[in-house]
From Swiss-Prot:
Pfam families in the cross-refs: SAICAR_synt (PF01259)
Record has Nucleotide-binding as a keyword: yes
Organism: Limosilactobacillus fermentum (strain NBRC 3956 / LMG 18251)
Protein name stated in the entry: Phosphoribosylaminoimidazole-succinocarboxamide synthase
HAMAP family per record: SAICAR_synth (MF_00137)
GO biological process, one term: 'de novo' IMP biosynthetic process
Top-level taxonomic group: Bacteria
EC id: 6.3.2.6
InterPro entries xrefs: SAICAR_synt/ADE2_N (IPR028923), SAICAR_synt_PurC (IPR033934), SAICAR_synthetase (IPR050089), SAICAR_synthetase_CS (IPR018236)
Length: 240
């Protein structure tokens, strides 16, 4: 069966496969900001983001988190479970940064006494507006049980990854997760990716940015930054 492009996103493409319950995901050498309004090419960025996400997903799977990941196909490709995506972003904030800082007039870098949990409706034309549980349920984006399961997974991910990144000399400032209903059984699982494209990472000593903010703020080379994140994580895991 000929593969067909199912979805072309800001940093990835999803392709059909011979198995109707599986997809091929391709990580692209590009980065966007302003909800895709500004796009730039970065050689090697797709492979670097892919390497980080695969490493993190393997770690999460080893610790009991269900994800869409099946296997690596190439330096920029994975085979994943097909999912009907929940149109929500689940954002966990451990430290004040980005829009959260500007929205509330707070200083970046301020530690939060507990993780802040926020949801946003995934719609580029609407600039991904904030949404709460009652609205998401009323609009039939998710059921109450699914919403609770997504947040339970987010909390597990935070508890697992915060110490891992600390061991690698990085502070997990915040991150955004996405979930889907697995095609073969309708089970909610972690999907999309986990890379500096969808989280903020700061060096624990210098507080230098090690994420997509280096592109947003023109601070450093994006691909080299992602490669450094991967090298640090790989070294931290080898110490276990």
């Amino acid at each position: 069966m000929e593969e067909k492009l199912l979805y072309a996103g800001k940093a990835k493409e999803m392709w059909t496969t011979e198995d109707e319950d599986q997809l091929r995901v391709v990580y692209l050498d590009q980065a966007t900001q302003l909800n895709g309004k500004q796009k730039e090419h970065f050689a090697g960025k797709g492979a670097a983001a892919h390497a980080i996400s695969d490493l993190v997903f393997h770690y999460l799977i080893d610790h009991g988190i269900e994800t869409h990941f099946i296997k690596k196909l190439s330096a920029t490709e994975d085979l994943v479970e097909k999912c009907a995506m929940v149109p929500l972003e689940f954002v966990t904030r451990n430290t004040v940064a980005g829009h959260f800082a500007s929205r509330f007039g707070l200083e970046e870098g301020t530690a939060l006494p507990q993780p802040v949990e926020e949801n946003f409706y995934k719609d580029d034309e609407l600039d991904d507006p904030f949404i709460n549980e009652s609205a998401a349920v009323a609009l039939k984006m998710v059921t109450p049980a699914e919403f609770d399961r997504c947040w339970a997974i987010c909390r597990q991910v935070d508890q697992l990854l915060t110490p891992l990144f600390e061991k690698a000399g990085m502070q997990l400032v915040d991150f955004k997760l996405e979930f889907g209903r697995r095609s073969r059984d309708n089970q909610i699982i972690l999907a999309d990716e986990f890379s500096p494209d969808n989280c903020r990472l700061w060096d624990t000593t210098t507080h230098h940015h090690l994420d997509k903010d280096v592109f947003r703020r023109n601070l450093a080379d994006l691909t080299a930054t992602y490669q450094e994140v991967y090298a640090r994580l790989q070294a931290a895991l080898k110490e276990d």
